[in-house]
Amino acid sequence: VIRALHPMMGVDKKTGEDRQKRLFELTSQTSLPTMFYNEERPRNVWIEQLALAEQIGSADSPTLIPADMAQRADMFGLCAVVLGEDGLVWNMRIMNDGPLGRKYGYSDDASVAAPGKVAEVIALLDQRLQQQAEQGSRYLVGDTLTAADIYWATMSMCITDTPPQIMPATQ
């Protein structure tokens, strides 16, 4: 059985309970999401989660990691500039001072630099998509869907106004 633990962040205002206490007890860290699979160690880093998903996927399902090593290197590189330290999502987090921003290294200087870094990643991905389109592909890497496409489609929601039909407002 695989499951992802994604508790609410922060402290419950009514009870004073740390909402991530159980996550820390299980994993010795508080990053989200965290994946659990059977009795194996928890996975909380995107690259480990992707490897686990590939490992436990059914044999006849498409893979998200290319078999071709050059394409694999491209795919992991693009994923890293979106998901990794000092990448798009990282810099989105440190644009504002707050608990999440401070967890990822917020400072006045980092906050000022962050929008430029986000713009660089978006420009890189735009250029890549244009190059791929010229070769007849609508994907970031090669001619099939990869993890880079999935991660970019998901994380691009943090830089666009997402319509409520795609992401309904929550309480």
Where are these regions (language model features)?
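GST-like domain detector, emphasizing the conserved glutathione-binding G-site
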Residues: 1-109
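Short, intrinsically disordered, charge-balanced linker/junction segments flanking boundaries
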Residues: 1-4, 167-171
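GST-like fold's C-terminal all-alpha helical module
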Residues: 77, 81-170
